[in-house]
């Protein structure tokens, strides 16, 4: 009995003075391990009679439980101390400037495209899409291009080696191809825009081999040039956020519209006129090619270059800069990720 009390006091004295978990584990082995002090006391049971074994065994088990509880309590204290020490060591200094968070930005072409689309959404336009690789019918024939039209030549159009019905495929030169597909596959009335990439064999300060267009089509009964002028005028003033902007509809020629017009604008009276888009009433031959009766339905179409509008609105001088990937230029002209327009105005994609 005295030996058991001595062992308990010894365990308490040693364990209470422990400063770390490693030393605590060593004392646990010393007292409760296979060759520990308490285990040594258990070995004495073999020399005792049955009654003594029962009493002594009960005391040893109580000793073992008390030492385990002491160790457990000390372990909790040491673990809390170590956690507090670690937290103090890892403390964040809130006065230190934060690292700059790297994030993407919106390219001016994307920004301009979304702004243009948002404006057209106010007129109830929907979006139609089509393939970048087209055949001769959708890109030229259905749009009333003559067989010898210069636009069909290889110096203007990218032709592919692949063929369809013994005729070469090509990269579309305008998104008017989308209008043809939509009219052939649907029934009027129509009111949609067709944004997308287009391709022409040209490269200088104002032309690139690949560029972005948005073309639009409105078709219904009794549509006339007055509707066309209203939509274009309202669109231009809304996009450039200038109600005083001047527009000039200048007679022109396009195979797929008749009459045709090119639209010039100037921000102020003293500015030079700038050409921004082409438009006109859909040619009866185009309607015939897609199976629509031109005596019942009329429509107008328009087409604009996204890069051209971006250059005018954001004051960008050289078209080629859009595609050079100069990080300094992009840092200056790109838009924040949250600046992109909200398309909740009713547009459907």
Curated annotation (Swiss-Prot):
Fetch the SUPFAM superfamilies from UniProt: Class II aaRS and biotin synthetases, tRNA-binding arm
- Could you tell me which InterPro entries the record lists for this protein? aa-tRNA-synth_II (IPR006195), aa-tRNA-synth_II/BPL/LPL (IPR045864), Phe-tRNA-synth_IIc_asu (IPR004529), Phe-tRNA_ligase_II_N (IPR004188), Phe_tRNA_ligase_alpha1_bac (IPR022911), Phenylalanyl-tRNA_Synthase (IPR002319), tRNA-bd_arm (IPR010978)
GO CC aspect terms = cytoplasm
Could you say which residues bind Mg(2+) here? 258
The answer to whether UniProt assigns keyword Aminoacyl-tRNA synthetase to this entry is yes
Kindly list any coiled-coil regions of this protein: none
EC number per UniProt: 6.1.1.20
The signal sequence is none
User: Which family is annotated?
Assistant: Belongs to the class-II aminoacyl-tRNA synthetase family. Phe-tRNA synthetase alpha subunit type 1 subfamily.
In Swiss-Prot or TrEMBL terms, this protein is called Phenylalanine--tRNA ligase alpha subunit
Gene expressing this chain: pheS
